[in-house]
Amino acid sequence: MNKVEFSHVTLAYGGNTIVRDFCLTVAQGEIVGIVGPSGCGKTTIVRALCGLKNPESGEIFVDGKPYYSRAKHVNVSPENRNIGIVFQDYAVWPHLSVSENVGYPLKKKKLPKDEIARQVHEALGQVSMLGYEKYMPSQLSGGQQQRVAIARALTSSKDLVIMDEPITNLDAKLREGMLVEIRLMQQRLGTTIIYITHDQEAALQLCDRVVILNQAGDICQIGTDEQIIEAPADKFVFRFIGVSNFMPVIEKNGKYYLHLDEDVLYADDTPKGWIDGPAEMGIRPMDMIFDDHGLTEGELTQAVFLGDMYNYFVRIGGREFRLQRSTLDSLDGREYKAGDRVRLRLVNEKYYPTEVKN
């Protein structure tokens, strides 16, 4: 069953189109991430879902019911859309206690006090905040304040929650833990979550599917984490998801070269995925592998230890490229240092037509 449907939604500010012909269905109980660079329209899309921004055209449905349709003159008011929202900056009211913050949506609905207390207790239990009912926000850490914000969203709606950059303001360790907590909570409750972020790693870790938007607000790809990483739809997606190396490539007399300041051999038979015509290769740093029998030669210019991996920078054909090697792989006894001549084997590369500049 589809929980949310955007049908050909176009959004604009002052005549400037931000999102054009946006179509997306979100299933009941699914976590869908909307990911893209700053200014691509991610937040505008969920503002439209919440009733805070009217589309120029298109329709929005929740549980099969129209929430917005300009053609049919339907526009359900924000307070009647029954959607929970979690913002980046916690947005807990500093003058209200934890229980008052969480119970505020229920108070607005004029529920009986005992029912409010019951639902507040239940929501705080879902986010491991029981015992903090009388605390003020100033007495809480950033992670605890965000848990309060999530609990408040649950009292607004356990069925559908929007999370807009909910972990951006937390430190790295708290971010990791909060993602796990959000997933466990969602599994317990069956909540449908639309997760807005520019953090690709967080979206891929948390979400069942991810929607990739480009700078123009167009959908480039919708897929699982594996689909997006293993089969990026285009060059933008490849570049946007993780670190990448890009370089022009050519074929000459049945051999394949990196077309740099000088041509550098990398394959002596047709590579998988090769396309005819001017092309560029995209390759991840982990897929450029040190191999004494590799066809590609370069000079190691820098080795940087990052704890769980090494970053290596290798100059090939006049340009510098990044390689990555896990610390475990580096336990083979082979040490690589600046100034070494190295040979490489390239795997899992992707090919894209060269963009023509007007």
Residue ranges and their predicted role:
Residues 35-37:
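The feature captures the beta-strand-to-loop junction immediately N-terminal to the Walker
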Residues 43-46, 148:
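ABC ATPase nucleotide-binding domain helices that frame the ATP-binding cleft
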Residues 50:
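Helix-to-loop junction immediately C-terminal to a conserved catalytic motif
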Residues 58-70:
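Conserved ABC transporter NBD signature motif
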Residues 82-84, 88, 95-236:
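ABC ATPase nucleotide-binding domains
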Residues 244, 255-358:
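Non-catalytic connector elements of ABC transporters
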